[in-house]
């Protein structure tokens, strides 16, 4: 039987689940809060049921402080980020991405920021740190807040400091596909007392789940811990594939993070460096094996940073060639993904003229991106198979044959 390897997965052992259960009876959220404060060296920390809710709480807090209404984010990122912006009564404004760094393009950001910009949302895409110094300098010129989206970059660093700590406020995600997963969950960190005060008001208004709902989340977390392991993923694949999101989210629920999840998160964080190091090692291996090859682009990494690859991004010069390699890689049992098939301005009607594409890089990127899993259930042998498929395809001239 050929074992399948999922595109995402955090190794949550039965011991971690047991520790999570024990912690959940001992104010585990407070313990996890202390852990995150220590990791980020931040004074304030708040948990919610998702990164989306964390972002929403931040935006609601900033609205209490400022009358500005525009929120700038990259045109290629999670489309779900639009939902909390609109729900908070704010206006999303997009800027293009860089085909060099795969992150927000600084020149494009400079063109769309103005006196009505409430905040800039730099996203560390794929666990690749963005140039936060450049972002902060631009924000300071306009007295604009910076909300640092470190949802996919937990464990990554810039100048030995973790991503998520450079903006006025930052947030992380513990969702299924993130670097450290407790099924779902989000976390806010800040040192800004004014922002923290307003976040506290929003946070305390979040509802707490009843016992049945908490038990369901615990059961789903345990099921996920089993399902992401290659053997069980293979056995359960038909059922699991039906549960994967294929439709666009139109809303989101907000509530308090559960004690059991906080307990598991606390247990996981004690061994987080092993998980982060695996992701880095796997990404570094792919980078070394694929750099310099004609027909593909790899991200230019920020100097003095460490990327903890959420997944490893490869940009192909040709869309049809990417599709062929995507199928070949998945036929080996290793689940590569294409992430978001369209940039945000082609998903939601935000008033942009699509005939004159205002964000050509984001559109180009969405059509040619392929992501390779880097989580701890991967290994060098599996990664070498992927490298061979890509190199063989490039050496055969297949990518040239499909060029238009």
Task: Give each language-model segment a name.
Residues 173, 309-318, 348-355, 367-379:
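Conserved PLP-binding active-site segment of the aspartate aminotransferase-like
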Residues 171-183, 201-212, 221-225, 256:
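Active-site PLP-lysine loop of aminotransferase-like
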Residues 1-66, 88, 274, 284, ...:
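Conserved PLP-binding active-site segment in aminotransferase class I/II-type PLP enzymes
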Residues 253-269, 280-287, 298-315:
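Conserved glycine-rich beta-strand-loop-beta hairpin in the small C-terminal domain of fold type I
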Residues 209-217, 285-288, 303, 322-358, ...:
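Conserved PLP cofactor-binding pocket of PLP-dependent enzymes
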